[in-house]
């Protein structure tokens, strides 16, 4: 009888079965750290300080504003909108921020999975179809307003993560 491979497998089994899951607290801390990093990157772009995140600009109503209570799915949806907006901007300032938003969304998906609430896939939003026209008319304003509102939304998310948001 050829039991060599079986014995090797049984000998390795304790090592193979010992898989340590990433503690959810670590994921939450990483999420908060990444949010703070993105806010710092936005602060480093000097022209974003000139607009309040609460200010309304005609034609830019599709850019999400502040939300007092955010669930994980609402956070993901909001970040997806900002990611689409930033990806359409030609500015080199927003490339890293857009990449950070993708990573942040991945961390939110991990947090949601830990609570057994998978987040639905976010598809392209209809409100962003007019983005091309708005960008042609006011590229600079769109960038400033989007980054300013993103910064406010991220700060709301940071506060909400301390309260352990629901699905």
From Swiss-Prot:
**Taxonomically, which superkingdom?**
Eukaryota
Ligase is among the record's keywords:
no
Keywords, A to Z? Disulfide bond, Obesity, Secreted, Signal
Q: Name one GO molecular function term.
A: hormone activity
For biological process, the GO terms are: activation of protein kinase C activity; bone growth; cellular response to leptin stimulus; energy reserve metabolic process; intestinal absorption; leptin-mediated signaling pathway; lipid metabolic process; negative regulation of appetite by leptin-mediated signaling pathway
* Signal peptide residue numbers: 1-21
Q: Where does the protein end up?
A: Secreted
S-S bonds: 117-167
Reply yes or no: does the keyword Transcription apply.
no
- Main subcellular localisation: secreted
Q: Which Pfam families match?
A: Leptin (PF02024)
The record's section on InterPro entries has: 4_helix_cytokine-like_core, Leptin
Cite the Gene3D superfamilies for this sequence: 1.20.1250.10
Q: Which SUPFAM superfamilies match?
A: 4-helical cytokines
- Annotated Gene Ontology cellular component terms: extracellular space
Q: What does this protein do?
A: Key player in the regulation of energy balance and body weight control. Once released into the circulation, has central and peripheral effects by binding LEPR, found in many tissues, which results in the activation of several major signaling pathways. In the hypothalamus, acts as an appetite-regulating factor that induces a decrease in food intake and an increase in energy consumption by inducing anorexinogenic factors and suppressing orexigenic neuropeptides, also regulates bone mass and secretion of hypothalamo-pituitary-adrenal hormones.
Record family assignment: Belongs to the leptin family.
- What is the designated name of this protein? Leptin
Which organism is this entry from? Capra hircus
